[in-house]
Amino acid sequence: MVKIKFGISSSLHPEKIPAPEEILNFAEQAENYGYDSLWMGDHIAFHGHYTDSLTTLAAFAARTSKIIIGTAVFLVPLRRPAIAAKIAATVDFLSGGNRFIFGIGIGGEGKKEFELCGVPVRERGKRTDESIEIIKKLWTGEKVEHKGEFWNFSSVSQTPAPLTKGGPPIWIGGRSDAARKRAVMKGNGYISYLYSAEKFKEGLTKMHEIANKTKGILQIEEGLWTPAHHSFIFCHKDEGFALKSGIKNLSRRYNMDFSGIAEKYLIFGPPEKCLEDIEKFKHAGVKHFVFKHAGPPEEELDQLALLSEEVIARAKN
């Protein structure tokens, strides 16, 4: 049986750009506190301050030794697939292999990002599907060709290939039926975002149905396909303060008012309440949690310790 894993995502910094050493220290501390995985979100131009996801993960790999690193999620349609394949393969290579998960999604909430990159928003799904096909071809390290709607090439290879046999696992993020189908048909896992436990269970049931009709069972317990959940979390003894802080964080992050819906998607409050919420997701089928700090930015490092010692250690037991 697959053991449930717990990861942490480096948070968006809505007000100030952190010093480089702060970002790298976060990675070291995540490994020191025993987290299974370390993640980066991805945006080209969004609300707040983001470093580039794959470049930052390469730096994380150099400052750590064994923690899994991953993108949650990399916005594939904003890049040419050959460039994405090359950089992702390099991250896998430099991290030593079997440490990198390439979480990808189609994006869309940041319309200006698509304008900036010259990509029509309406094409993002089709571009993602074709990009996955190209990336997998290029990761073989062999000479390959491709004829598609957006890209065409012949007799081209990229080296070095990823050290991970077959390439890094690709997890598909999203909340739509199309994303779930993409995760089953083209991915090695699925990662939900802004979901309730009930919605996650419903989505996983649909993915099992898709798999049974097309490719057979999802090999979850064999560790070959992973249902994951990305959740904002703020563990604090004062439940009201935790919720208020979470609303403020999410509202800044997305430049919209989350006061009416934050409670539905946040894990917040004292350790006991956070554990109860995590248990709901475990029963819904989550095998890998990716937490992102939803409280005041200055408390992010303190949360690393608190979550590890008071929540995750107990959730694993």
Task: Locate predicted features.
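Active-site-adjacent structural elements that line small-molecule/cofactor binding pockets in enzymes
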Residues: 1-317
